């Protein structure tokens, strides 16, 4: 039976068109001198550079690409999910990452011909348009394209049947079958779900640690590590902070849980086992809807929780293989930020 949580987008739809716009290569143009008034910006290709961004609830990645498709710089800044931090703050973080990349490559901002930004929290058309307008104002003269984080992740996975699992601050899965039909599930935000995400793992760890303290009168090993490494004097202080800024507090607990799990902490391992099960369920839902279960498909993992914990990676791979035994598990062919840049050029 099809689950209502998944949404179908057929091959003729917007998502397919956006996710496949990454293969065209622009021709190179000659160098010209730019009088920027800064010793750092000496030469730039005439309006040929492209910026690509991958922005989520924790950080933003930016790549600067030349006309031949070569990555000249890769820099990072803070969160740029506009649904969580607001359009103004998201734009500021994108500008920060862009300026770092431009400075590193000694390129002036007015040499940027186009930019593509794959951003979490832009699933609604009105939010996409708000971000597009904001970035168009920040980068006058550049063609601005806004994609969701899932769109650029699917593009970064390459062609053919594939399911992309995004496991970062939030969680979601998107898949494409051999007919080009695309399905997605998850990505509803932490207050509505996003099981297995860094936010979910962090909130589960905090809830468990506080419950154990109430029952035993002392902090568990994991609980002590959470308080110590986050710099809180008490659980009351952590609760106050989490009530005000949950998006800051709970995802920051994930690295602590990950390290504890690799150190064989039983509580941390139990939390991550549950998270792996939640994430594999997302992939299985997409496979059922896209009729991918009988195909030789690739499952691609990406996001901030991937590659951070040996135990979690092993358990997640095992859960995925149980759900889809015939699937292969691998990584993206390029970074989502690079996919966004290539899509913006086409």
What residue ranges belong to the model's regions?
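Glycine-rich beta-strand-to-loop/alpha-helix junction loops that act as flexible
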Residues: 116-123, 167-169, 297-308
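Glycine- and acidic-rich phosphate- and metal-coordinating loops
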Residues: 112-118, 147
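Short, intrinsically disordered or compositionally biased N-terminal tails of bacterial proteins
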Residues: 16, 20-25, 38-46
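Short, basic and Ser/Thr-rich N-terminal targeting/leader segments
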Residues: 56-58, 113, 167-169
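Short, positively charged and aromatic/hydrophobic N-terminal segments
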Residues: 33-35, 42-43, 147
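Phosphate-binding/catalytic loop of phosphoryl-transfer enzymes
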Residues: 122-220
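ATP-binding/phosphotransfer module of carbohydrate and carboxylate kinases, centering on a glycine-rich
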Residues: 41-110, 134, 139, 156-162, ...
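Low-acidity, Ser/Thr- and Arg-rich intrinsically disordered low-complexity segments
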Residues: 3-8, 12, 19-24, 29-33
